[in-house]
């Protein structure tokens, strides 16, 4: 009996752990065995990794309208099409349903990836193009270039990666449109440019893109937090550069791939807002978040914000988190103040304000968006009412002049009446009679 109970508990625990792990589907159009180090690094970070062939008819992203995977990696270097399962439309639906997508393509990329990039405002160069640099390259090859134009955003790329040295890159490039949700992670050198090996001579006179406006790795984050990564180098993730046993091992490439996948798969740079409360100052916590308050009440708003870093919750401390109190237009826009608390996983913020002298439906709203961080959009609606008849003060300060005039008129009237009543009337003068002769 005890052994059966132990087995049942063990199975239940394993299922819970399995459910908590993020699932990753790695899809390739070629032998995926050359990415064993990269895929193993995902497994070491507690991702549940599965692999598939890009034209496998049994592969699917959805079942009964539900997304089957949390994250998708698309590795394409030789196929001319993505197949029906992984078409640009299906990939966009996967992202819109809450999934994260990491696209890695080489110079022989299919047109479907270029179409997907155009949908995201990431414009990839033509097939058979390659990025070259005649001044910053690995020994013996102009198309294996050394790059140090790494993003300075600390929420995406760590200081350790930036200090590890230049990135080895061999592949295609792209440029970005005006979409504010996209940002470059790896730029070209001032001497880098795109070269089409099929249509151009050994040196391109009019390159498609060049210099620091040539982007090699870029990311996109939607307004609801879904993330997409795009890399133009399929070789960057191969064992040739990521395996410590390889003579071409690059620590900077290994760290770069780790940071990039951690961000795209939402293991870092994820903000979470919890415990949003509001109420009157000195009101018990259990009485907060009521549906109705009174105008001119002194109110307090509080919220806890945490930052996910390498899968661990940490306090997020900032001085630019703003709170708005809105009824059509903001009545207040104030900065939330970080307040010390006992929590080791989140930062407590507070703001104190006086409710407007205007009744109606109001909304507390926080809208916080920063590059590299998932957006925070929290709001709660409540009603502000007028004073009840027994809540008005006995005397209003603004009415003091009217009170004074009223009492002064009353006093003057009483004084007049008193004077009039107390004043003795004068005796009438009787004229004397004239003597008769």
Curated annotation (Swiss-Prot):
What biological-process terms (Gene Ontology) are attached?
protein N-linked glycosylation via asparagine
What's its membrane topology? Single-pass type I membrane protein
Question: Which pathway is recorded for this entry?
Answer: Protein modification; protein glycosylation
Annotated localization = Endoplasmic reticulum; Membrane
| Entry GO terms, CC | endoplasmic reticulum; oligosaccharyltransferase complex
Q: Tell me the keywords, alphabetical order.
A: Endoplasmic reticulum, Glycoprotein, Membrane, Signal, Transmembrane, Transmembrane helix
Q: Which residues lie on this side of the membrane: Cytoplasmic?
A: 423-437
Highest rank taxon of the organism: Eukaryota
Query: Does this UniProt record's set of keywords contain Glycoprotein?
Result: yes
Show which residues sit on the Lumenal side of the membrane. 20-401
Q: Which residues form the signal peptide?
A: 1-19
Q: Which residues are glycosylated?
A: 275, 289
Any stretches that span the bilayer, and where are they?
402-422
Protein family: Belongs to the DDOST 48 kDa subunit family.
Protein function = Subunit of the oligosaccharyl transferase (OST) complex that catalyzes the initial transfer of a defined glycan (Glc(3)Man(9)GlcNAc(2) in eukaryotes) from the lipid carrier dolichol-pyrophosphate to an asparagine residue within an Asn-X-Ser/Thr consensus motif in nascent polypeptide chains, the first step in protein N-glycosylation. N-glycosylation occurs cotranslationally and the complex associates with the Sec61 complex at the channel-forming translocon complex that mediates protein translocation across the endoplasmic reticulum (ER). All subunits are required for a maximal enzyme activity.
The text the record gives for the protein's domains is: The cytoplasmic C-terminal domain contains a functional dilysine-retrieval motif, which is involved in the retrograde Golgi-to-ER transport of the protein.
- Give the quaternary structure: Component of the oligosaccharyltransferase (OST) complex.
**Protein name (database record):** Dolichyl-diphosphooligosaccharide--protein glycosyltransferase subunit wbp1
Report the source organism: Schizosaccharomyces pombe (strain 972 / ATCC 24843)
């Amino acid at each position: 009996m005890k052994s059966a109970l132990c087995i049942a508990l063990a199975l239940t625990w394993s299922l819970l752990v399995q459910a908590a792990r993020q699932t990753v589907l790695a899809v390739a159009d070629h032998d995926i065995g050359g990415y064993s180090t990269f895929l193993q690094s995902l497994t070491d970070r507690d991702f549940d990794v599965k692999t598939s062939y890009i034209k496998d008819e049994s592969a699917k992203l959805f079942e009964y309208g539900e997304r089957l995977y949390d994250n998708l990696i698309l590795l394409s270097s030789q196929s001319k099409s993505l197949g029906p399962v992984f078409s640009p439309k299906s990939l966009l639906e996967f992202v819109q349903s809450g999934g994260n997508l990491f696209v890695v393509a080489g110079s022989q990329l299919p047109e479907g990836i270029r179409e997907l990039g155009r949908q995201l405002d990431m414009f990839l160069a033509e097939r058979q193009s390659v990025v070259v640099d005649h001044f910053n390259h690995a020994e013996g090859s102009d198309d294996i270039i050394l790059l140090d134009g790494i993003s300075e955003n600390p929420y995406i790329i760590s200081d350790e990666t930036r200090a590890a040295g230049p990135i080895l890159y061999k592949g295609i490039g792209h440029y970005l449109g005006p979409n504010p949700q996209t940002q470059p992670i790896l730029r070209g050198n001032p001497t880098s440019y795109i070269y089409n090996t099929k249509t151009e001579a050994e040196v391109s006179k009019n390159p498609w893109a060049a210099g620091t406006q040539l982007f090699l790795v870029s990311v996109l984050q939607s307004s609801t937090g879904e993330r997409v990564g795009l890399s133009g180098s399929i070789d960057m993730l191969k064992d040739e550069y990521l395996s410590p046993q390889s003579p071409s091992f690059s620590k900077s490439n290994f760290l770069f791939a780790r940071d990039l996948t951690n961000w795209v798969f939402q293991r870092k740079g994820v903000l979470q807002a919890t415990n949003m409360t509001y109420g009157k100052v000195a009101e018990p916590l259990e009485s907060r978040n009521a549906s109705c308050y009174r105008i001119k009440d002194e109110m307090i708003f509080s919220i806890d914000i945490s930052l996910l870093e390498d899968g661990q919750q940490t306090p997020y401390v900032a001085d630019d988190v703003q709170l708005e109190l809105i009824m059509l237009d903001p009545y207040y826009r104030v900065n939330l103040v970080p307040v010390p608390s006992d929590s080791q996983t989140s930062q407590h913020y507070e703001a104190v304000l006086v409710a407007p002298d205007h009744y109606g439906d109001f909304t507390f709203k926080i809208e916080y968006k920063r590059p590299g961080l998932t957006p925070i959009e929290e709001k709660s609606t409540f009603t502000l009412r007028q004073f009840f008849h027994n809540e008005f003060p006995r005397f209003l300060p603004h009415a003091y002049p009217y009170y004074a005039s009223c009492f002064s008129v009353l006093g003057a009237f009483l004084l007049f009446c008193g004077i009039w009543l107390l004043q003795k009337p004068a005796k009438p003068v009787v004229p004397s009679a004239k003597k008769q002769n």
